Amino acid sequence: MTDPENNDQLVKSSDPEHPANLIPELCKKFYTLGWVTGTGGGTSIRRGDHIFIAPSGVQKEMIKSEDIFVLSYPTPKYPPSARQYIRKPRELKPSACTPLFLAAFDRGAGCSIHTHSQWAVLVTLLVEREKGKNGCFEINNIEQIKGIPKGKGKGMLGYFDTLRIPIIENTAFEEDLTESLEQAMDEYPDTYAVLVRRHGIYVWGDTPAKAKTQCESLDYLFQLAVEMHKLGIPWIQ
């Protein structure tokens, strides 16, 4: 059996697009946007039968390729002890987001991103106040909506389409979000994101580039929605 603490060749590559190189670069970018402040958030990329995941509880802007965990895929979500790590950095903790990332990969994603964006948190509070706990985020007639897919193989949303993002309730522990996240995925099969009230958002895409640009588009829309609300401008026309 391969020793997961000595399988360093899995994260050594001169290719800047290799997941072990790309995850640290993405985390640095996300830090500048305020998405992964104070060790929060995370990023994971699937390449073939390997999943690369940023560690938990570390300064995301300081992550290096040697800090990346690698899982064999597919792998069980629960219990954590059953997950098939083929590389585990010493003295670092696996991401608490792991089962939620796995839920996205089980639906065909190539990359999953979790942020603690303030704009994402604020829209969950505004939706709760206006629509109650069962409401979802909805917005239309905004150009940036075109950056979000309609669903798998359905192309992109158009200007006149309505973007809908489900919202789930937060839990005391990250991993406990998994069941409600998967339920939201089932109820909104075309979604590429799930908001977590008072917490942040999970976004996934077919590739790292698509996940990143979708996350950027959503954050733009959330910030715009907060500003529109201040001005009394409705999100739905």
From Swiss-Prot:
Q: So what does this one do?
A: Catalyzes the dehydration of methylthioribulose-1-phosphate (MTRu-1-P) into 2,3-diketo-5-methylthiopentyl-1-phosphate (DK-MTP-1-P).
Q: Which reaction does it catalyse?
A: 5-(methylsulfanyl)-D-ribulose 1-phosphate = 5-methylsulfanyl-2,3-dioxopentyl phosphate + H2O
SUPFAM superfamilies, per database record:
AraD/HMP-PK domain-like
The record ties this protein, via SMART domains, to: Aldolase_II
The record's principal subcellular location, in a coarse class, is cytoplasm
State the similarity comment. Answer: Belongs to the aldolase class II family. MtnB subfamily.
How and how many cofactors are bound, per the record note?
A: Binds 1 zinc ion per subunit.
Q: Which parts of the sequence bind substrate?
A: 97
> What protein name is recorded for this chain?
Methylthioribulose-1-phosphate dehydratase
Required co-factors = Zn(2+)
What would be the name of the gene that encodes this protein? MDE1
